[in-house]
Amino acid sequence: MKISLLTTAVLMISWLSTQARGLEEIFAERGYVSVTAIEPDIMVSLMYARDDNFTGVVLYDDGIKDAWLHPDAAKALAKAQRELSSLMPGCHLLVKDAARPMSVQRRMFNAVKGTPKA
């Protein structure tokens, strides 16, 4: 019983510290990089940071606005943006989705569970 309570307390503290830090800090700690930090010409409009997505609600509660990706993916997008800019000056890539926490993935799954979208 004591071990179970201790485990529960540790998990709760871990969860609370994760909530307080914010997604962007957690993504950075896990090695993801901000797409716009790598290439400022890439535009970002995250679908799940707005309510005009398939769930109808904002899923990023802490106001995340930047796209966080694996460094290799971010570098590849930056290379593509540079190529696009050389071929079509003034045109920009638009990132609509990127790394997302499992909590958001669960909310998405629950939003479509039992519907034809599932």
Predicted regions mapped to residue ranges:
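Segments that shape or occlude catalytic/ligand-binding pockets
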Residues: 101
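Hydrophobic h-region of N-terminal signal peptides that target proteins for export
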Residues: 9-19
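Sec-dependent signal peptide recognition
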Residues: 2-9
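Extracytoplasmic cell-surface/polysaccharide-interacting catalytic and binding patches
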Residues: 19-98, 106-118
